[in-house]
């Protein structure tokens, strides 16, 4: 019985130590989430402005009806997928949901590796696709908690360049969209060709008047890739925010479960201790009775 009590007590101590770790990780993730949410809000200011400028420009008389490879759909021979996952675990179902969605989509829409290419951001996704011998064109690991454009700009520019060079004919970004600290949703958004401009968006505000220098095509050739890159970067910031929220929720769940186990073990320990004391009393009384 004494051995059993020691084992239970050791388990309680071990789980308490684990709960302290998960509790600390929860607080760290909460802090990262707060910073990521602010970064996402700050980026939206830039994103909304460049979208407004691009929308006004495309619907102005100077460029209305113009053709550009970034805007024009072409026959799809090969599709590109930017898939955003985390580099580490302990984020609940954050990675599994997006990876399952991408895997199902590729199996449904493509018959061979020649029909798609994956651009993986995050080590978990890279390892997942490589283990299944899927076509990973290139990857980026070790993303910062609040990734700057400088860190991801190269891979984003490379993805847009592959589209411009017709290495694939459409580009999707697959990621977890952050809704709030408790929920997220899988999104697969078509980034290229750019086709999400609504003519009605320009209603309600005065259109910007443009004077184009040096010429229309040069302006579009520079502006449209920059706009596409901003969309992709926005998805990365959004995905990172969802990752921190998932990590916080997972660690909170782990801490709550640890507390429940500690409570159950404490009850078990008290019952075992009470049984041991009762047994000792019974033995003492029995021994005293034998001496009479």
Swiss-Prot record:
It is a peripheral membrane protein. The keyword Transport applies. One of its GO terms (molecular function) is proton-transporting ATP synthase activity, rotational mechanism. GO terms for biological process: proton motive force-driven plasma membrane ATP synthesis. It is found in: Cell membrane. Belongs to the ATPase gamma chain family. F-type ATPases have 2 components, CF(1) - the catalytic core - and CF(0) - the membrane proton channel. CF(1) has five subunits: alpha(3), beta(3), gamma(1), delta(1), epsilon(1). CF(0) has three main subunits: a, b and c. This is ATP synthase gamma chain. It comes from Streptococcus thermophilus (strain ATCC BAA-250 / LMG 18311). The gene is atpG.
């Amino acid at each position: 019985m004494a051995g059993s009590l020691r084992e239970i007590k050791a388990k309680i101590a071990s789980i308490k130590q684990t709960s302290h770790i998960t509790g600390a990780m929860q607080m760290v993730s909460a802090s990262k989430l707060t910073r990521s949410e602010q970064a996402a809000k700050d980026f939206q200011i830039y994103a909304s402005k460049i979208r407004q400028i691009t929308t006004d420009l495309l619907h102005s008389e100077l460029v209305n009806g113009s053709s550009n490879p970034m805007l024009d759909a072409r026959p799809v021979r090969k599709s590109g997928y930017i898939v955003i996952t985390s580099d580490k675990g302990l984020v609940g179902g954050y990675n599994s949901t997006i990876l399952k969605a991408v895997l199902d989509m590729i199996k449904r829409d493509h018959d061979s590796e020649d029909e798609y290419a994956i651009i993986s951001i995050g080590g978990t996704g890279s390892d997942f696709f490589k283990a299944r011998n899927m076509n990973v064109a290139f990857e980026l690991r070790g993303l910062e908690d609040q990734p700057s454009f400088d860190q991801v700009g190269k891979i984003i520019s490379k993805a847009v360049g592959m589209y411009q060079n017709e290495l694939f004919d459409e580009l999707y970004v697959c990621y977890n969209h952050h809704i709030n600290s408790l929920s997220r949703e899988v999104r697969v958004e078509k980034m290229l060709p750019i086709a999400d401009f609504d003519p009605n968006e320009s209603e309600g505000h005065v259109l910007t008047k443009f004077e184009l220098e040096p010429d229309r095509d040069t302006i579009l050739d520079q502006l449209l890739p920059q706009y596409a890159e901003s969309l992709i970067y926005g998805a990365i910031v959004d995905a990172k925010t969802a990752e921190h929220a998932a990590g916080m929720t997972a660690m909170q769940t782990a801490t709550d479960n640890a507390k429940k186990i500690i409570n159950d073990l404490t009850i078990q320990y008290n019952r075992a201790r009470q049984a041991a004391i009762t047994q000792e009393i019974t033995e003492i009384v029995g021994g005293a009775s034998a001496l009479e």
